[in-house]
């Protein structure tokens, strides 16, 4: 049976049926619709004002690759400028290949690129070193806890280094639905309440962050990358298989099989969630060490680094953080090297 005609241009043969709407589109019309929807998300949400210098968190994976490509297409209409910021977590045999993909993208799209490294920012600590430090104590799960906090801080530092006014990340609807499930299963009411919306306004001196792909499903992100023939890195992190997020992802797939709208339902439910006044966490203050937003004396990044430098990495996770205040000062970390912008190589 021949493929139906594209429901948009009525000329080309349809190449796909959109998972959300069931509309049959050719590849070109699908990509145009995808870009128009991202544009609407940005404009309607007032996420990136004209004149914004936008740091794009670039990992080399499909989501950040699609985000960078779409924003590059939309930049003239939005009146924004882009700067790719990549984070080198120090994961041997994995991150080097991903960074190579980012460098190819930067060269092909003529976008400036800056790479910041954990080792430079965090006293010599890399994720491989963190993994060795947490070996034998739920290593993979602990690694993801450390990496999520440190990567967020590294991206913020990289964005400041390049003079960015806003930070964007490639989180899609599936990512956000998984996060909602994780916070619900952990009983983390505070994070559930903070998880709604398309980003954060930049409280306490932090740069405003947003997620322009938050309403786009993972399937459509993959389809866009396919039809635009984008070059991206697709291997999973070596520390990811045992992470709690994987269990939330499996649960989400089962929910989606029974209810196709489950992903966006979860995303929108987080936006509508409101906590009772007695359940709301206190307003964040400033970290006593680095000045970043913090709900306690130390922010998450400083608390995790304290645990590592004391040789007790698990102490800084969850309720164990309270114990850090009762101990003496940590060992002095190794001196950090200054951050530098990395020129884009010629390819």
Curated annotation (Swiss-Prot):
Keywords: Cytoplasm, Phosphoprotein, RNA-binding, Transferase, tRNA processing, tRNA-binding
Top-level taxonomic group: Eukaryota
Modified residues (Phosphoserine): 200
Compartments where located: Cytoplasm
Pfam families in UniProt: ATP_bind_3, zn-ribbon_14
UniProt-listed Enzyme Commission number(s): 2.7.7.-
Pathway terms, separated by semicolons: tRNA modification; 5-methoxycarbonylmethyl-2-thiouridine-tRNA biosynthesis
Chain segments carrying region Disordered: 315-347
Broad class of where this protein is predominantly found: cytoplasm
Molecular functions per Gene Ontology: nucleotidyltransferase activity; tRNA binding
Gene3D superfamilies: HUPs (3.40.50.620)
InterPro entries on file: CTU1-like_ATP-bd (IPR056369), CTU1_C (IPR032442), Ncs6/Tuc1/Ctu1 (IPR000541), Rossmann-like_a/b/a_fold (IPR014729), TilS/TtcA_N (IPR011063), tRNA_thiolation_TtcA_Ctu1 (IPR035107)
Gene Ontology CC entries for this record: cytosol; cytosolic tRNA wobble base thiouridylase complex
UniProt record, GO biological process: protein urmylation; tRNA thio-modification; tRNA wobble position uridine thiolation; tRNA wobble uridine modification
Subunit structure: Component of a complex at least composed of URM1, CTU2/NCS2 and CTU1/ATPBD3. May form a heterodimer with CTU2/NCS2.
Role: Plays a central role in 2-thiolation of mcm(5)S(2)U at tRNA wobble positions of tRNA(Lys), tRNA(Glu) and tRNA(Gln). Directly binds tRNAs and probably acts by catalyzing adenylation of tRNAs, an intermediate required for 2-thiolation. It is unclear whether it acts as a sulfurtransferase that transfers sulfur from thiocarboxylated URM1 onto the uridine of tRNAs at wobble position.
Stated family: Belongs to the TtcA family. CTU1/NCS6/ATPBD3 subfamily.
The name this protein goes by in its record: Cytoplasmic tRNA 2-thiolation protein 1
Organism name: Bos taurus
Origin organism lineage: Eukaryota, Metazoa, Chordata, Craniata, Vertebrata
Gene field: CTU1
